[in-house]
């Protein structure tokens, strides 16, 4: 299983959002994939059309950061088959407590 932790994911528009979307779509064709992404308006249409699981985290930016890290850390504890954690930025990995292999796309 691959875990994607990102602040940049559709339906929000942008280059990093497109990169994370394309990367996640490609990975999900070969591996079970779970995404933790920031809440975006009108996300339901996209989330319902993909073959991987997307968990959206909302709230104020500072609270969202800690809440997302907590949810990711809990998910990692419960799922021992995670092979790799992929993040869009070092800030997305900052509070993740795991010795699993990590890939960070710094932009």
Model-derived segments and spans:
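Extreme N-terminal starter segment of soluble prokaryotic enzymes
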Residues: 1-3
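Alpha/beta-hydrolase
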Residues: 5-6, 106
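Short His-centered aromatic/hydrophobic patch
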Residues: 87-92, 106
């Amino acid at each position: 299983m691959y875990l994607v932790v990102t602040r940049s994911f559709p339906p929000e528009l942008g280059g990093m959002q497109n990169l994370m979307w394309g990367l996640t779509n490609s990975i999900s064709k070969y591996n079970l994939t779970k995404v933790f992404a920031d809440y975006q308006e009108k996300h339901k249409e996209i989330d319902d059309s993909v073959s991987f699981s997307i968990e959206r985290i909302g709230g104020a930016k500072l609270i969202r950061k800690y809440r997302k890290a907590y949810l990711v850390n809990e998910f990692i504890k419960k799922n021992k088959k995670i092979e790799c954690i992929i993040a869009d930025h070092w800030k997305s990995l900052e509070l993740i407590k795991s010795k699993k292999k990590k890939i960070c796309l710094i932009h």
